[in-house]
Amino acid sequence: CPVAEEHFLVPAHEARGTQGEDQRPAGAASELELQEEGPKLGEERPKPEAGALEERGPRPVVSIVRPRHGPKRKPAK
């Protein structure tokens, strides 16, 4: 087990550097792709977006419901 932990820690530091470098160009590329797709979606359906904004305005804000993290535990006696 200690060998596996040491083996895991060393590549983790190396992987963090490579992941950070890989994520930045990938993130920039994905942002460019999203920007290219964004106008296309906007051109295809500008009316539903405008309608959605109009509908959201007068509606009251709904309270945020937090996701549950499993069933409630009974107190130990």
Swiss-Prot record:
InterPro entries: DUF4691 (IPR031516). Residues 66-77 have a biased composition (Basic residues). Residues 1-24, 37-58 have a biased composition (Basic and acidic residues). It holds the Pfam family DUF4691. Transmembrane segments: none annotated. Residues 1-77 are annotated as: Disordered. This is Uncharacterized protein C16orf86 homolog. It comes from Macaca fascicularis (Crab-eating macaque).
